[in-house]
């Protein structure tokens, strides 16, 4: 019998397999685009269903009806509340300054009304609880305009090389939770001036998913995967079960290494943390964008995307949503971030919504 070569099924490229630092995923690389728009969006995973659609991609099934599993991500409007400016430092980009809008009341926040007491007024900064840049106690509109003017001068002098939008989610709009996630998004464009003007126009306002993304385009999905806790090497690394007459365990590694070097190598498959890892999945197609929990199939037909009995462990989709082809990492209700594809294939599907002939809204219970 020849030499049996069976490497582990798990990649060492993801080691060490430990828990993500934050449940809010980070994005370190951005695509280069000439169109001036925010490069991505964020939402909450509602669940999966399936559709029938006319295939518009080149291939054997082009023009035919195909089955497609899809993930529904609910995307309540993001609130743009700041600008972060970068300059080129010795080791690369470094933060030059930040401009945050003055505090404002949240009219759509579901504050509880207690007996005999007036309804409490929730403001944006009170909700964030110090999760933004430190601000003076009496941060007025005049101070905000002064800082904005200083940033404009820095851009004109050529000191600033990039500007990005600081945004916050609004999960209370969909009755999911109260505390928002704060994150940063790059802006497409050819010059710093046009990027700055885009954010300046949106400051303090809400941004909907339909204003940012296009139906049919390819996206990269960034999320923290489902946590599995401590698992053994068979499930964690996909090693083979040992033979029937092997001693001292069956779901173990046969050998953890040679006598010398007299230490256990880091490459040996071991038990440990599995899941709750930060992962990016490339080139997921955005099939459709819906509004207020409804998907428009044609001029006369509009359906509720929520299946009978609601999405399991999630409930009803009330706001805007994205319908993305295939599965998406992460648990139900978890924050999911997307960006335009950074490494799209040579043969890209057309940037338009494919013709959807059927959407399953049967119970998923």
Curated annotation (Swiss-Prot):
The keyword Ribonucleoprotein applies. One of its GO terms (cellular component) is cytosolic large ribosomal subunit. InterPro entries: L3_arc_euk, Ribosomal_L3_dom_3_arc_sf, Ribosomal_uL3, Ribosomal_uL3_arc, Ribosomal_uL3_CS, Transl_B-barrel_sf. The gene is rpl3. PROSITE patterns: RIBOSOMAL_L3 (PS00474). One of its GO terms (molecular function) is rRNA binding. One of the primary rRNA binding proteins, it binds directly near the 3'-end of the 23S rRNA, where it nucleates assembly of the 50S subunit. This is Large ribosomal subunit protein uL3. The lineage of its organism: Archaea, Methanobacteriati, Methanobacteriota, Thermococci, Thermococcales. Residues 343-365 are annotated as: Disordered.
